[in-house]
Amino acid sequence: MDPMIAQGALIGGGLIMAGGAIGAGIGDGMAGNALVSGIARQPEAQSRLFTPFFITVGLVEAAYFINLAFMALFVFATPVK
């Protein structure tokens, strides 16, 4: 395998994971912010706010794991000569 292709695949995979981690962190933070502000406004609505929060966090983390799969495809499926 050409070393330039391997280096490019590893750098690209690292950038993919960095972007996914940053996006997941921002998404989880925004969902947590909405949860805390909603509970601060209406403490009695806490039980109703947790379900959408966990669904949102689950979807954000699912997107991160899809990103992980694309990174693995990008890094480990490089052409071999």
Swiss-Prot record:
GO terms for cellular component: plasma membrane; proton-transporting ATP synthase complex; proton-transporting two-sector ATPase complex, proton-transporting domain. Keywords: ATP synthesis, Cell membrane, CF(0), Hydrogen ion transport, Ion transport, Lipid-binding, Membrane, Transmembrane, Transmembrane helix, Transport. CDD domains: ATP-synt_Fo_c_ATPE. The keyword Amino-acid biosynthesis does not apply. Its main location: membrane. Gene3D superfamilies: F1F0 ATP synthase subunit C (1.20.20.10). The chain crosses the membrane at residues 4-24, 57-77. It is a multi-pass membrane protein. SUPFAM superfamilies: F1F0 ATP synthase subunit C (SSF81333). It is found in: Cell membrane. GO terms for molecular function: lipid binding; proton-transporting ATP synthase activity, rotational mechanism. Belongs to the ATPase C chain family. Dicyclohexylcarbodiimide (DCDD) binding to the active glutamate residue inhibits ATPase in vitro. This is ATP synthase subunit c. It comes from Mycobacterium leprae (strain TN). The lineage of its organism: Bacteria, Bacillati, Actinomycetota, Actinomycetes, Mycobacteriales. The gene is atpE.
